[in-house]
């Protein structure tokens, strides 16, 4: 007992568990659950097929008992339970499990209803014809062989398959910490994809999908939607929805409808499916079914679902799709062993690995065949030498007391070449000379020296080979060998020829075993890009002060003459008014900047479309805004271009410039666009090119204009720098990035405004007080905003009462900076203008002329006022 105790070594249980479990996990991953990307087989499948091949259980020979094969597999290669091996054989023989069966079974191998196969002592099997293509050239040293579990047998590490079996038959398995689930595909399509890859190794996933549109299941059915396929082929993971093929038939006399199911999804148990439908009918979870029966037979599947007279067959069928396995999801997870390591692979990765495997197999096969051809040519040379020297050789053999001495005598002396010289000359450059042949053998000094192998071949020569006809056959065979050797050397020396051989073999496989696609792939509404269904049109987007947002077509608003009463743009709640207004395209992205400096994304078409009088929807229901957070600026963006900046201005006069690409990745929770100080908020956002100028307009009628490059580009979370020096309670109301020669239109809260040429605003330094933009008087009120306009533009103005006026810019006077302007919109008492927006596409003049409108009396002739001393002083201050 003490001796035993001395053999016990204490170990840390954590380390032992970690080490042992890791060993177990890797054993399961590599040796059991995952297929090799090259041949698409797990170890148990590979061992079964190899055992059948060794047994000579070929497709064109008699069947053998399954028990015989199972015994060989578990006895030689797979030391596990017989049931696991037999289950593997059964699955490879089921037409509803494998797209291309690898085992040809005779007997009861189960059914799609879940019936078990008969015992292995009753069933018989042999290799399917296509299975031989997985093991073709196995005897030509094309793959490495490894020891079996006890070292008494050898088994191939991988099959030299000519078929891309991983994609063709798929695979599924659960390992430790990972799993694989690869759907089967159509052989013709997969090989076409491989050929396309051979032609262009830079082919894209989309290019491969032109040849391989999606999985092809043995049970056919319908794949509903392409998006999951595209995702799986691109990333290695995805989900597809498989729907049963069913049709609704109506009785011509009674009008009653019947649902006929001809195909069900892959891996669905038909009997359980029917039981589930019956259960749903019994529990009244599905209404409208009067009878259910299975009429499937040897000619095909047929599930009959009779619909009640008052029910609609399509409605019943849709309910069955949603509540039963008439529609299922298939999660694609393309994990396979690549160089012995588990790896998730996309479609191109799998095809690339298979083509590389074929390149290695064909190369090794060519080397093997070249060696064998040279060895045979070496023997033929000896036989030709024997025929050329027949008399002395026969005399030598007759005199030799033993075969060993005869062999030694043949090797010890040179022999005349005779007519063999021409034959050897045809070979040229020692192309047929074996690599192992020493220099002293073969042709030397005009004579031929035999090797031991050649001497033995001469001794084994039958007398009938001495006839003239046999001599001609020998020469013809040698000539054919020389041609074969030349071709083999060409394959080894030319990558193009090597790939051509691979292509030819794939085409032969396709032509021999290829068939039509079974599974139909249909478009799903989820696959259709919603933008493709939405027409592009210009719309008016409005955001009220209390956060109601909507859009409506721009054509809903008719142009009115200056001073018109306008039309209501929105029915607003009491004490609410339109706070933001812009014109955008339905396909644009709206960048929504909040009062807290955060940015949210929305497509214009995602906004609620509402009529002119409707309020819209609260934007808090569309965006994940926090408490007391509101949207203060919105900006339409078509594309996120390099070199374009987002320029932001706050009410306190702070400005910030950030690259537009910083905002190109939408996040559902939003991101920080600018850090704001307490009490500050965004008032304007625009896009700049890096060489633009910036204009900031304040409520007190001041404006500062400076170069954009005076503000460096900053990150998203930066606060910014001062753009304008404000006095007292003044605040910035508008940001303009002037472009072209358009004028600046300034509007005040009492409905007055004016146009002033942009070049009248001098360029100053950043962070100064600026110059006067418009006279702020009791009549005008403070400045509401400013926009840049052209003569052909129209503008839209909106009041806090919800009144909107659309006016042609050409009707507004162009005056100097230091003026009060003219009336643009008549407002009621206690009604103020709160926003304006330029409209770049005016309607026809005929429409404008047809609209009634009034012009404010005397306003049109208001002349520019002389600058006061205070104004001059303000300008001189800069």
From Swiss-Prot:
Active site feature: 122 (o-(5'-phospho-dna)-tyrosine intermediate)
Record's subcellular location: Cytoplasm
Compositional bias of kind Acidic residues: 857-878
GO biological process assignments: DNA topological change; DNA-templated DNA replication
InterPro entries: GyrA (IPR005743), GyrA/parC_rep (IPR006691), Gyrase/topoIV_suA_C (IPR035516), Topo_IIA-like_dom_sf (IPR013760), Topo_IIA_A/C_ab (IPR013758), Topo_IIA_A_a_sf (IPR013757), Topo_IIA_dom_A (IPR002205), Type_II_DNA_Topoisomerases (IPR050220)
Catalysed conversion reaction: ATP-dependent breakage, passage and rejoining of double-stranded DNA
Recorded superkingdom: Bacteria
GO molecular function, one term: ATP binding
Gene Ontology cellular component annotations, sorted alphabetically: chromosome; cytoplasm; DNA topoisomerase type II (double strand cut, ATP-hydrolyzing) complex
Motif GyrA-box positions after renumbering to this chain: 560-566
Enzyme Commission designation: 5.6.2.2
Domain Topo IIA-type catalytic: 34-533
Keyword Cell inner membrane: no
Region of interest (Disordered), ranges: 844-878
Phenotype for residue 597 to D: In gyrA209TS; a temperature-sensitive mutant, 15% decreased growth rate, decreased (-) supercoiling even at permissive temperature
Keyword annotations of the record: ATP-binding, Cytoplasm, DNA-binding, Isomerase, Nucleotide-binding, Topoisomerase
SUPFAM superfamilies with a match to the protein in the record: GyrA/ParC C-terminal domain-like, Type II DNA topoisomerase
Family according to the record: Belongs to the type II topoisomerase GyrA/ParC subunit family.
Note: Few gyrases are as efficient as E.coli at forming negative supercoils. Not all organisms have 2 type II topoisomerases; in organisms with a single type II topoisomerase this enzyme also has to decatenate newly replicated chromosomes.
Subunit structure: Heterotetramer, composed of two GyrA and two GyrB chains. In the heterotetramer, GyrA contains the active site tyrosine that forms a transient covalent intermediate with DNA, while GyrB binds cofactors and catalyzes ATP hydrolysis.
Biological role: A type II topoisomerase that negatively supercoils closed circular double-stranded (ds) DNA in an ATP-dependent manner to modulate DNA topology and maintain chromosomes in an underwound state, and also catalyzes the interconversion of other topological isomers of double-stranded DNA rings, including catenanes and knotted rings. Replenishes negative supercoiling downstream of highly transcribed genes to help control overall chromosomal supercoiling density. Negative supercoiling favors strand separation, and DNA replication, transcription, recombination and repair, all of which involve strand separation. Type II topoisomerases break and join 2 DNA strands simultaneously in an ATP-dependent manner.
Name of protein: DNA gyrase subunit A
